[in-house]
Amino acid sequence: MSFELRFKEEALSEWRRLDGSVRGQLKKKLAERLENPHVPAAKLSGHPSRYKIKLRSAGFRLVYEVRDAHLVVIVIAVGKRERNTVYQAAASR
């Protein structure tokens, strides 16, 4: 069962500013997560239904939320890991 992908408005703006190669890598990982979004190793602490995708080589993170009742994965924030900015942005949204 595949989940539908949606973006928060702020996350979509961040997504559009990404370099094409980074966006391509994230797209590939997102496609995998739409099939199975609940990855225990990627769960964010303090948020019951939020997970992350890491691009270790590029230093980027994507934070998403899973809504099982509607079969939706919502991208909350996309950005660099530096100084936890992507996690702070996700916490405020």
What feature does the model see in each segment?
Residues 17-22, 43-46:
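Short, mixed-charge, low-aromatic patches
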Residues 28-55:
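A short, surface-exposed loop/turn module that caps and links secondary-structure elements
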Residues 2-6, 10-17, 24, 38, ...:
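Enriched for short, Lys/Arg-rich terminal
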